[in-house]
Amino acid sequence: MKFWKLKMNDRNYLLVSVRREHMRDVTLCSEQMQQEHQSFVGSIGKEDIRFQIVEDAAPVGICSLEAVCCLGFWYMKQFEKDTCRIRLQEQACRMKCFRNLVTLEIREHDTYCMPQAYEIQDAMHFSTPEGFESLIPIYRKAYHEDLLHKIAVGVSRGGKSLLRWSNNKIYLSAPVYMDYEGIVRKM
């Protein structure tokens, strides 16, 4: 079994591939997901990565953007690509990678869960309450209410994500780091 530890916005993600020779079916888990007894499985077919929650086979929602970015980053590094397509709730979005900076394209008209509280610091910065991972609905609402410019830095726990607005699409950019990788052998 091969494993990789990735880091994004000060959160750790563990990626495991049981079939080492193919690396087409991988399972992703984080500390927060472990507390909620959840893990994702990502199936890679041709140029697509499809996600679903392991425990109930439900499709993964857009709220787990950090996990999506980590798996996309891993895929592009393993297969030496600079772009890939991600499927979330049967909707495709594109992801690009330059060195360790991952950019995910998100459609503006898609629906997202709206957190109850958000705080605009100034026209370029906004923060989310502790425990909220998704910056997209906050950014979308603030942009439409003319509280933010086209580019904003979202401050999340331990890190920052850059959000950019262009052609009715939102682009989320954030650095992802490969902490280490290894192999677990059966004894």
Give, region by region, the residue ranges found by the protein language model.
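A glycine-rich beta-to-alpha transition motif near the start of alpha/beta enzyme domains, typified by
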Residues: 1-99, 115-187
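Intrinsically disordered, low-complexity regions enriched in acidic/Ser/Thr/Pro/Gln residues
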Residues: 103-106, 113
